[in-house]
A protein has these predicted regions:
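Zn2+-dependent metallopeptidase catalytic core
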Residues: 54, 288-316
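Alpha-helical interaction segments
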Residues: 4-5, 47, 294
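Auxiliary tRNA-acceptor-end handling modules of aminoacyl-tRNA synthetases
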Residues: 22-289, 298, 321-338
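Bacterial Sec-dependent N-terminal signal peptides
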Residues: 1-22
């Protein structure tokens, strides 16, 4: 009986620490698109998942690189861009990447379901549910961050630079650029790879080519609403397009759908040939850019406004200096980084 009492008491303290939403020397709470907290004593990040079966954007990237153009693992390099969602299975949450290549654009739920079942999805990661608070599930997010998502090991091996593996004892969460905003959350981790350097490229750039470290970045980003109107791709336009197979297409139509990638602009007054827009495209210039480069960037980027005005959108493309109180990692700001 006494054993059960103490066990219950210990578990209670564990749960309180995991789900704590206060900031102190042992806990740092982040509130945003996803809430999460960092526990210093455990050296872990616990994510609060309140969005089950809701799509969002997941992007991984490298904050720091290796410094070799030939290897191609560079500072700021984007990795994969994926539409993902959390799904609950028993006492697990799985981070699932639905198959966007094969779809059924239809109001017929059975038709949509048939196509979804015909093609494989990808489970990116699995998490044990540590605690449930109403409709919020708490998971240990740390192992997800401390993995080789960017594929550094595979890249080095393919270029015959050596066989490396991730050394977790020399890896750690990086809190400096781990942040939360209303529409996105950002995470970083320093990853150290150990192995026997075999290639000239890796040997020429790292202080110790048998131990190389990079900082890997992860972004979870809220998707916009469904009011965007897609536009068919015309090969004469020179536009960039995205494509997928639509199995709900009428038999006389092409099953391969192509839509251009474009900005979302809406006129305030659609009856006018020239009208201001509801929400302009605004790019913010890094205030750290020196002169005369800053002015050149401002003038060059602002030139695009002429192109938009030529097709009837007034003041649709704007360039401003990033405000002092704005964070360039907040996805509400499009930043031209110096």
């Amino acid at each position: 009986m006494r054993y059960n009492f103490f066990l219950t008491l210990i578990l209670s303290f564990c749960f309180v620490s995991v789900s704590a939403q206060n900031n102190n020397e042992n806990n740092k709470f982040f509130s945003g698109f996803f809430n999460f907290n960092y526990q210093l004593k455990l050296d872990k990040i616990f994510l609060e998942v309140d969005k089950i079966n809701e799509d969002f954007l997941y992007i991984n990237s490298l904050t720091t690189g290796l410094g070799s153009n030939d290897i191609g693992l560079d500072r700021g390099q984007l990795g994969n861009e994926r539409i993902v969602k959390f799904r609950k299975y028993g006492n697990k949450l799985l981070l699932v990447q639905p198959n966007q290549n094969f779809r059924a654009i239809s109001n017929n739920a059975s038709e949509v379901n048939s196509v979804e079942q015909a093609f494989a999805n990808s489970v990116i990661f699995g998490f044990e549910i540590i605690e449930k608070k109403e409709d919020v599930y708490i998971i240990d997010f740390t192992p997800f961050l401390l993995q080789d998502t960017h594929g550094v090991i595979k890249r080095l091996k393919s270029l015959k630079q050596g066989a490396y593996k991730l050394d977790l004892s020399k890896s750690a969460l990086e809190l400096k650029r781990t942040k939360a905003f209303p529409n996105n959350v950002e995470f970083e981790a320093l990853l150290t790879y150990v192995g026997n350097a075999e290639g000239r490229l890796i040997s020429s750039i790292a202080p110790d080519p048998n131990n190389i470290s990079v900082i890997q970045h992860h972004s979870f980003i809220k998707l916009p609403d469904n009011n965007y109107k897609s536009r068919n791709f015309d090969p004469r336009s020179g536009a960039i397009f995205t494509s997928f197979m639509d199995y709900a297409s009428p038999v006389q139509d092409q099953i391969n759908k192509k839509y251009i990638i474009r900005h979302r602009l809406k006129k305030i007054n659609s009856d006018l040939d020239q009208s201001d827009v509801v929400e302009p495209i605004i790019y913010y210039l890094d205030p750290g850019a020196p002169e005369p480069i800053k002015s050149a960037l401002m003038d060059g980027a602002s030139w695009w406004n002429e192109a938009f005005e030529a097709i009837g959108f007034k003041n649709a493309f704007q360039v401003k200096i990033l405000p002092d109180d704005a964070d360039p990692m907040d996805c509400r700001y499009n930043v031209i980084q110096w």
